[in-house]
Amino acid sequence: MKTQEELNGVKVPRPTDQRYSIALFFTDYFPKIPRLKFSLKGIISDGLPTTAPHLTRADSYVRQPAYKRVDVGLSYELVGKDYKPSSGLFSHFKEIWLGLDCFNLMDISNVSSYYWVTDVNDIQYAVPNYLTRRQLNVRLSASF
């Protein structure tokens, strides 16, 4: 949604001016192996405007780069309503899932914020702080 305001006769974007944001989540199971599920999540959104700490938005602003991310995951049902052992340790659980996820599959460097550095001439430069790049995650979830 495009949001802007007029400051001192100049139209500037508001701090929440994110013109687009698209997200997709898809999950499915494999027909031959119904206990194995696959999930895919994708996000792309416009960057937010930001201003140096000692300036006003009417003076100058920069826009962060677009945020892009794709996550994939596989989950395997170890114990469930159709696959419950009658005795032993696992018989006390309703469900147990073992999962493997790859966050930020494309290894994209997304900017979270900026660290502002001032030089001797009192000029400020935006140094980006990046979010975590590609990361693998193994999870075990259980319900009683």
Regions found by a protein language model. Name each.
Residues M1-T51:
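Gram-negative outer-membrane beta-barrel transporters
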Residues L7-P13, R57-V62, I123-P128:
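Extracellular loop and loop/strand-boundary signature of outer-membrane beta-barrel proteins
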Residues P15, T27-Y29, Y61-R63, L89, ...:
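Residues embedded in well-ordered secondary-structure elements
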Residues T16-I22, A66-V70, K94, T132-L136:
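Residues that define the transmembrane beta-barrel architecture of outer-membrane proteins
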Residues L24-F26, V72-L74, V138-L140:
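Membrane-embedded beta-strands of outer-membrane beta-barrel proteins
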Residues I43-P53, Y76-F144:
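C-terminal beta-signal and adjacent terminal beta-strands/loops
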Residues L55-A58, V62, V70-V72, K84:
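Active-site/pore-lining binding-face segments in mid-to-C-terminal subdomains
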Residues V62-D71, E77, F144:
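Outer-membrane beta-barrel transmembrane domain signature
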